[in-house]
Amino acid sequence: MESVESAARDYRETLAELRNNNKTQINLLTILADDFKKAAPQIVEVIERHLTTCSPSQKLLVMYVCDSILKNVKKPNDYDALFARKIVSMFEHAFRQGDERIRTSLYRIRVTWASTTLFMPSKLYELDMKINKLDPNWPISNPQTGRALRDDPQVMAPSQSRPAGNATSPAASTSTNRVFVNPKFIGSSTPGAASASKTVVEKTKSPGTVNKEKQVKKEPKQDPLDKLLPSSSASKTSSSPAGLKRKSAPSEHPNAPIRKKPQQPPKPQTAIDEDLRSISLTKKPPVPSAQDQDFRPKTLKPTSVIGSHAFAPVAAPIRPMIPVPPPVSVAPFVPAPPLSSAPPFQHPQQHHPQLPPPPVHQGMGRGYHHNSPPQDPAPIVPVQAPPPQQHLPAPENVYSSEQPKLDVPANNRIFVDGKAYEVMFVDDTAVIERGGAPHRIYFAGPPRNLVIDGIPHLLQFDTPTQIDILGSKHMVKFGAPSRELYIGGHPFKGQFGGPPIIATINGRRHEIRLTGSAPEVRIEPEPAYHLTHFLHKMREEKKIEIASEKPEKKEDWLSYLKNLRTRNILPAPARSPSSPRNQTPPPANLPIPGMNNAGQRGGYHNRHQPQQNARWGGANKQQNIPPPPSDPSPIGSGVEKRSAPPAAITDFNIRLLQIRYDSVVDALITKRADACKFCGMRLDDSQGKSKEWQDHMDWHVKQNLARHGSNNSAAVPYRQWYPSTSTWLTPRASDETNEQEADKPEEPLPGVASSGVKTKECSVCGEKFDEYYDDDEETWRLRDTVNVHGKIVHSACASDAARSLDNSSFFNDSDIKKEEPFD
């Protein structure tokens, strides 16, 4: 008992530390819940209590913790059953207290529950009914599937359901695929109710087999998108009763006209009393029809759901019920135009779209016109309809993608052992050429989540998976570098963990994200010899692509010739003899009409401008400014130039480093006033007046003295260029001394033991000594110090200390001699 209480207390303290959407803390809470499975009731109670007491901004975080526990804790556990009892009240409380952003996030959590088996569909239906009372825009899930999508064809709002009176009719023409939402479903979803409904269905199917077959014919199976496409559903429902009436009517003559009657609402099945003896069981051959048929594709009316036309199944071609044409002597008709003026025969698909659609009437009374030619024995070529067995092919899915802005260079190369290989594709197989043979490459690793419009789908690498995208099935699989994803055989380029892929599927935009980091790229060790004959073709295609990508350098011959003329390499054009000489030159500041500021007309240089300037003699030669040399284009030189880099750090990109900025170059060249002129170190703007400047300059002086030595020292800081006479005459001795000096071990830095030193400052320079511990002698010493006549000074200050001591001893001796008395 104590362990359970301590586990609940620890979990309460850890949950109270959750302040923001931190994935690490949420994972920690999930791991704790997995470790404390025995205290599952207490932990669920702690989570519920914290949800009701925390601030509204943290309620979403608590729901994230619940979602993580439900999805990640190992089975079996008691959390699923415990959360199922309280999830409706917890979700409703978080939804009621949250703002629009929190409600959107809660909806995303609810969508993920629909694709898993965490809760029963009835529980999700109860949750949706609760939230729908708070927000009418909240979609209600299907009690059978649990999906909470608004465009689910099996979902219908409660307001669209029919009244209870019509529901009691045994022959109500309802679709078998639709599920009408009833708020009383929760109370009625019991085994007893299910058995009762089963008996009712058996009773309705009990009348004879003939009525059962007629019922199947009378109630065709409707499409799930009938509610979205009212035009198609209306045409289907209006054609079925007419066919039944035609079948029940006695046929007196095979060519007798069948008059259409006004449509009536379908009667219940029990009200139809029909003499089965009057029905002919022999199937009569169809009467050839000469009436024109409209083969134009049916236009879909606009619907409330965007993009629903793309997923509407193509219905089989329905042959319209064409009445048999009456005899010529009985039924009047409008004669067709003569055959001489009629256009030549064309294919039905090319000819009939030009004709107006035939008028639809309730009967064949007045005003009925027939568009077919008269039925006479003249040989007229009838319009052939497509055979009954020929069906139009189903429309193929259309894919297109928008290139995302990736943070990686757009090339198809991979590096293996420091060597770059070009990735080539044979259909959807990625290969590289290695050792003259093709090797297949592919992604490998654990399964990844592919998020399509916020819905995750778990995919295995190198294994195609069928995914339902808005009612349409698509084969999706991971690809290879530069073609990371395939949907329906169409490649998409993306980045794992990067920006989303914007794909247009059947006219509707979708956002696709590749989650996680970049997967491992594996290379098959065995060459794919069956792809060897494709290598030459792929090489040629790659050369063509590279050649097409190279920009064509435009040569400006006009500016080149002008530069030659300004350098007096080319002679000036001959002056026209008819040109007037005594003309006043135009003002220099007035522009010539039709020219822009650059001296161009319509985008090209004016060829007559130098000739016009030459007419005014030498008085205006100084005003003739030669055209400036054209700057090299960024394409030709390969370097783009700009004035200044972008100011915002968020706009920075790796490609911006390839651009030459004039402001950056000027800043690097310009001499800074706040930098040291010797080393370039940046200091303050006091121009040498602050203590920082003075200390820095003193440091330079000390470095120079230590490097070159003082003026009084006789040591030479550098080696002489030419050897001296003694060194030249005795080379062996010099070599031996050099060898002896080289053999000497390096002496440690001199240092005086700090135990007996009273003042740890140099008596010459006044700086403090650096004290260190000597491990060899196990004592504390003063670094780089020497003892000069009882005074501890730096090694560099030893000469100055000795000189000062000699001077002081000389003065002391002279003073002593002066004080001695004379004998």
Swiss-Prot record:
Residue ranges with Basic and acidic residues bias: 200-226
GO CC terms: cytoplasm; mRNA cleavage factor complex
Region described as Disordered: 142-176, 188-301, 340-395, 570-643, 728-755
CDD domains attached to this UniProt entry: CID_Pcf11
Polar residues: compositionally biased ranges: 157-176, 188-198, 609-624
Protein name as catalogued: Polyadenylation and cleavage factor homolog 11
GO annotation, biological process: mRNA 3'-end processing; termination of RNA polymerase II transcription
Organism: Caenorhabditis elegans
Any one GO molecular-function label of the UniProt entry: mRNA binding
Top-level taxon of origin: Eukaryota
Biased composition regions of type Pro residues, renumbered to the chain: 374-390
Low complexity composition-biased segments: 227-242, 342-353, 571-581
